């Protein structure tokens, strides 16, 4: 089989399964409205959970940062790309979340890959929730360490895996809020069993940070858990992009020496760091509380109105509200029907989710209004 035949076969298989991914060029993709092909849609696909991507103070902070620092960082943080803006953001994040140190990364994917690659050796073991994000599972699969997966949120199964002999160290990996189901991990129970077996806990709280807990401190703070490694990302609740790893001072020093994604990547622009500082300020103040409270009300309105639909509604109290349809083609058809009625919704299919669980991944944000939720419910009930 030639290269071209190999590529064609893979694409043909995706098409045959109604699983071929595609991109849509949009004129505006975050916030309440999505604009594509000169048409405006109510946007139920954005991860901009607090509606901060268009916040004027955050936009102005980025503009002022670009005027002060330029539009790029100029290099790796180990060379010339670590600015006073990066330093200030790291210090503010560490203070906010109660850690000694924070290290910035260009993306959550990079942060997860970097930590696992740097921390794990052949004699070690990673024990990961089966539904962990692709960045975590890919990094674990590529690691020389052993990978074992526990049944989603099943602490008993986790304990059984941790109890089997391991010559090295054990790292338990999970998410705070799961990206495709919107449910939360029982972090207190997971931490307890991890500590009983002398392991470390790594939590990716991409979808909880900024959105839940006191001052938006996220899933771990809400459940009174402090993992050894906490990954937070800035493309969701913060409305920007990038990520950070929160950890002890010695672990931060270690990652600065051995995390290749940190050493060899160009740092995020200092202007971006300034925007993130402005976003953090909004998240922590009363305005952040008001946005979180509004989001909770919108979620409650949606869940109350969707109960009698012929789909499985995931057990989620988060901004992620999946309607599990099952069949790929049915999910695509329903997403298209919603778009025709002015609601932009994304169909998520295998391999992103398990076979037979294709779904509409609906996301609600504080930028929505109650009438937006009512319109979505009207269309879902076939009355659009």
Curated annotation (Swiss-Prot):
Key words, A-Z: Biotin biosynthesis, Pyridoxal phosphate, Transferase
A family per Pfam: Aminotran_1_2
Transmembrane segments: none
UniProt KW Transmembrane keyword: no
Molecular function in Gene Ontology: 8-amino-7-oxononanoate synthase activity; pyridoxal phosphate binding
Annotated binding of substrate, by residue: 21, 133, 352
Domain of life: Bacteria
Pathway: Cofactor biosynthesis; biotin biosynthesis
PTM-bearing positions, type N6-(pyridoxal phosphate)lysine: 236
PANTHER family the record matches: 8-AMINO-7-OXONONANOATE SYNTHASE, CLASS II AMINOTRANSFERASE/8-AMINO-7-OXONONANOATE SYNTHASE
Oligomeric form and interacting partners: Homodimer.
Name of the featured protein: 8-amino-7-oxononanoate synthase
Gene from which this protein is expressed: bioF
């Amino acid at each position: 089989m030639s290269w071209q035949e190999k590529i064609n076969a893979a694409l043909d298989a995706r098409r045959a399964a109604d699983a071929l991914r595609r991109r849509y060029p949009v004129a505006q993709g975050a916030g309440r409205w999505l604009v594509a092909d000169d048409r405006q849609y109510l946007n139920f696909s954005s991860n901009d959970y607090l509606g901060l991507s268009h916040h004027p103070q955050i936009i102005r902070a980025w503009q002022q940062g670009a005027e002060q620092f330029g539009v790029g960082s100029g290099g790796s943080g180990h060379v010339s790309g670590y600015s006073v803006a990066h330093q200030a953001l790291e210090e503010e994040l560490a203070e906010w979340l109660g850690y000694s140190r924070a290290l910035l990364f260009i993306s959550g994917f990079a942060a997860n890959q970097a930590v696992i690659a740097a921390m794990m050796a052949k004699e070690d073991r990673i024990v990961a929730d089966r539904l962990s994000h692709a960045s975590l599972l890919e990094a674990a699969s590529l690691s020389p360490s052993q990978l074992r997966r526990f049944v989603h949120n099943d602490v008993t199964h986790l304990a059984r895996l941790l109890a089997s002999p391991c010559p090295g160290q054990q790292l338990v990996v999970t998410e705070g809020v799961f990206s495709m189901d919107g449910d939360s991990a029982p972090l207190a129970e997971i931490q307890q069993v991890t500590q009983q077996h002398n392991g470390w806990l790594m939590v990716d709280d991409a979808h909880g940070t900024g959105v839940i807990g006191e001052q938006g401190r996220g899933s771990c703070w809400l459940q009174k858990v402090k993992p050894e490694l906490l990954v937070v990302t800035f493309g969701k609740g913060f409305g920007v992009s990038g990520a950070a790893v929160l950890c002890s001072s010695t672990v931060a020093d270690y990652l600065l020496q051995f995390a290749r994604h940190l050493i060899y990547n160009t740092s995020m622009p200092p202007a971006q760091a300034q925007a993130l500082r402005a976003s953090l300020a909004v998240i922590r103040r009363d305005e952040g509380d008001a946005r979180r409270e509004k989001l909770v009300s919108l979620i409650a309105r949606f869940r109350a109105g969707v109960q009698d639909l012929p789909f499985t509604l995931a057990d989620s109290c988060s901004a992620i509200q999946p309607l599990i349809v099952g069949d790929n083609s049915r999910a695509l058809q329903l997403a298209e029907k919603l778009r025709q009625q002015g609601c932009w919704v994304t169909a998520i299919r295998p391999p992103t989710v398990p076979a037979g669980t294709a779904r509409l991944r609906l996301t609600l944000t504080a930028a929505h209004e109650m009438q937006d939720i009512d319109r979505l419910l009207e269309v879902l009930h076939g009355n659009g």
